[in-house]
Amino acid sequence: MQSSNELIEIKDKLWNGSINVRILMGDDNIKDPKEFLITVYRNSYFPIYFPSVITYFQKYNEKIKYMPVWLEYETVPIKWNLPIGVLYDLLHLSSIVQNREDSSWTLTLRFSDDYPTDQVIPFTYTDVDNSVNYNKSLKEVVVNQLKQSCFVINGNSKPIMNLSEKDSDELWNSIRIHNLKSFNQINKKIIPIQKKFQKLPVKIYIPGSATIIHAPIYPYSDSGEAVLLRDILEEYLPDLMSSNNETLGSIYIHGINVETIINKDIIDVWELFKHLDNFLYIIVLFSTYSTI
């Protein structure tokens, strides 16, 4: 078991984990694709960076400021409501594991009247100059996700609904500017003390599969024993475990292979690795393209 100082250091590293992204402008009217290089936080959201990206690209096409944009990876629209690190692990990690691509991530920025609303949440708000307000849409979605996780953890959404206007604003600003100290000060008002959790909000993704396991997890069994990460995987992904109790794939959280902690209490894994919406996102790569 790590000391409190070690846990603080790990959480700080997870909070500040980053990804190098290369964004190409998807405009058929431009012969040579323009690119924008940026380092983004894993525990953040793409719309936070859209204003900077748009400011750079609008010198090539002014329309981009007034049309909602989306990102694509290998022609597939990216769901911006998920944390960037989760998207990276879900869509790109398998290519790295197979040594087919390097760790940087190349995406294409698209904009048109034909927004892929069947795959991506649309941006519906605008500013007074008719430019797209990405911040307002993102805030609405993230706060809703925090309400969902709060309900799972507490059995109701009262802790987040009862936040003062000042605390609500500070919580959002801490996410927007990526301030861990401010975030923790408000988030602790949402999460019950002394680990008195009703359930734990957990989502499990399998790259290449449309299946999403959205599993509110009881941290303790009926007999009072702590539920392990292994127990969760065996229950929801029985094909992951072999007959001799070995894993047939790799388990990633925040881009880290966590097989060494598979026998840890799920409540401790959640507490350490939860994302800023208080969900624990687990990515499972089956052995067809995973290495341990």
From Swiss-Prot:
One of its GO terms (cellular component) is phagophore. It is found in: Preautophagosomal structure membrane. Keywords: Autophagy, Isopeptide bond, Membrane, Protein transport, Transport, Ubl conjugation. There is a cross-link at residue 147 (Glycyl lysine isopeptide (Lys-Gly) (interchain with G-Cter in ATG12)). One of its GO terms (molecular function) is Atg8-family ligase activity. Disulfide bonds: none annotated. It is a peripheral membrane protein. It holds the Pfam family ATG5_UblB. InterPro entries: Atg5, ATG5_HBR, Atg5_HR, ATG5_UblA, Atg5_UblA_dom_sf, ATG5_UblB. The keyword ATP-binding does not apply. One of its GO terms (biological process) is cellular response to nitrogen starvation. The keyword GTP-binding does not apply. Gene3D superfamilies: 3.10.20.620, Autophagy protein Apg5, helix rich domain, Phosphatidylinositol 3-kinase Catalytic Subunit, Chain A, domain 1. Conjugated to ATG12; which is essential for autophagy. Belongs to the ATG5 family. Involved in cytoplasm to vacuole transport (Cvt) and autophagic vesicle formation. Autophagy is essential for maintenance of amino acid levels and protein synthesis under nitrogen starvation. Required for selective autophagic degradation of the nucleus (nucleophagy). Also required for mitophagy, which eliminates defective or superfluous mitochondria in order to fulfill cellular energy requirements and prevent excess ROS production. Conjugated with ATG12. This is Autophagy protein 5. It comes from Debaryomyces hansenii (strain ATCC 36239 / CBS 767 / BCRC 21394 / JCM 1990 / NBRC 0083 / IGC 2968).
